[in-house]
UniProtKB/Swiss-Prot annotation:
One of its GO terms (cellular component) is proton-transporting ATP synthase complex. It comes from Pseudomonas aeruginosa (strain ATCC 15692 / DSM 22644 / CIP 104116 / JCM 14847 / LMG 12228 / 1C / PRS 101 / PAO1). GO terms for biological process: proton transmembrane transport. Belongs to the bacterial AtpI family. It is found in: Cell inner membrane. Keywords: Cell inner membrane, Cell membrane, CF(0), Hydrogen ion transport, Ion transport, Membrane, Transmembrane, Transmembrane helix, Transport. Pfam families: ATP-synt_I. Disulfide bonds: none annotated. The chain crosses the membrane at residues 10-30, 32-52, 71-93, 98-120. This is ATP synthase protein I. The keyword Transferase does not apply. The lineage of its organism: Bacteria, Pseudomonadati, Pseudomonadota, Gammaproteobacteria, Pseudomonadales. InterPro entries: ATP_synth_I.
Amino acid sequence: MPSRLPAFRLLLVQLVVVLVAAISLWISWGPVAGYSGLLGGMIAWLPNCYFAYKAFRFSGARAAREIVRSFYAGEAGKLILTAVLFALAFAGVKPLMAPALFGVYLLTLMVSWCAPLLMGKTFTRP
């Protein structure tokens, strides 16, 4: 469980960022911007959840092959899931505000890019 804790924290921070961004868009630009932003955030967050589940199922030196295999499967599944979710959003949601969708999508990805800078010190042990 301790090796999974940083991934869980990151997913939780991403979810909070998605919700705050979607609510901010809803208040400032209206409901279409709000749900478009929420969709964009979910398009980034759900595949990250899938990857975390797949990547951190195994631990220990004896499971090295399974760990590598699960990382590859998690990343492939993440890419496919992202493409499918984008396709569903653009095909099935009308009206959709694309700048809000892509903006919150990128903001959510940036949380994971910046996580080592923001949360790095909380993961180390003495």
